[in-house]
Amino acid sequence: MQWMEIKIVFDAAEPELAQEMVSYLVMEHGAEGLEMTTPGETGMVQDGSGSSVPDSKEHSVTAFLPLDDLFEGRKADLTRALDDLKGSVLTDYSVHFSKQDDQPWETAWKAHFHPIEIGESLVIKPSWEDYENPEKRMLIELDPGMAFGTGTHPTTAVCLEMIETECLKKAPERFLDVGTGSGILMIGAYKLGARKVFGCDNDMDALEAAAKNLKGNQVHEGDFGLWLGDLLAGIVEGAFDMVAANITAEANVMLIPGLPRIMAPGSIFIASGIMAEKKDLVLEALDACRFSVERVQETGGWVGIAARMP
């Protein structure tokens, strides 16, 4: 398969925030093999974090879209999304296109995916690296491949930290991750004491990667379940006492009205993947469904929200 390399070069008053938001947008529009550069350094990883080497003279985000029947639509949607950031997050930007084969970048991101500690008790590490663990943290070991997050993006870190906080109060009997991707939130919840963990995603490749990662992290087959579908479509089992969704603000707004059908009374919902300027959209949707907001956490321009069902 051929791929289109898309390089977005930009100027911004807050370049780190802009870089995170642009990288998140391109991943949301189906991009893979993400690379981010900053003047004086560069770092290549799946979701924008990791080590760096002296190299770049510009702020940029480079990613790859498959040259398939969906390419033109994705390209147009991404252009509109970038235009929405201009004037607020971005002062200016340009986009450059180049056809590429996938082999040169298929595994290059691995060199920059290193262990990262999350919260008080978790650490995410790649399967190919060793990790000294004097604090006896619970290990989440991933080999996510190109298409799924390594867990180092701020939205994932915020979500895992909030899951940890709630699990320390009371670990759930039944945990659900909406848009599970690599399965990292399911694994984290299980390590933190959840008895049964479930996940849904609209991408079969994601579900296959999640199943592999769950088994690789000693989550017993009888303790997890995976569904294919958008948001809550296809989920017939209810009474979850913790639900997490690390998706966009707009997707969270669409998700929230359906939550009372599948959540137990008094259960907790954790929403992440929310740009700070869009948090009110999610807060309003929660209020309309009578959720009580218990915590709002912001990191690097991204927001996580914990809210309780009535």
Curated annotation (Swiss-Prot):
One of its GO terms (biological process) is methylation. HAMAP family: Methyltr_PrmA (MF_00735). Its main location: cytoplasm. Belongs to the methyltransferase superfamily. PrmA family. Keywords: Cytoplasm, Methyltransferase, S-adenosyl-L-methionine, Transferase. S-adenosyl-L-methionine binds at residues 156, 179, 201, 246. The keyword Acyltransferase does not apply. PANTHER family: ELECTRON TRANSFER FLAVOPROTEIN BETA SUBUNIT LYSINE METHYLTRANSFERASE. InterPro entries: Ribosomal_L11_MeTrfase_PrmA (IPR050078), Ribosomal_PrmA_MeTrfase (IPR004498), SAM-dependent_MTases_sf (IPR029063). One of its GO terms (cellular component) is cytoplasm. This is Ribosomal protein L11 methyltransferase. Its EC number is 2.1.1.-. One of its GO terms (molecular function) is protein-lysine N-methyltransferase activity. It is found in: Cytoplasm. It catalyses: L-lysyl-[protein] + 3 S-adenosyl-L-methionine = N(6),N(6),N(6)-trimethyl-L-lysyl-[protein] + 3 S-adenosyl-L-homocysteine + 3 H(+). Methylates ribosomal protein L11. Gene3D superfamilies: Vaccinia Virus protein VP39 (3.40.50.150). It holds the Pfam family PrmA.
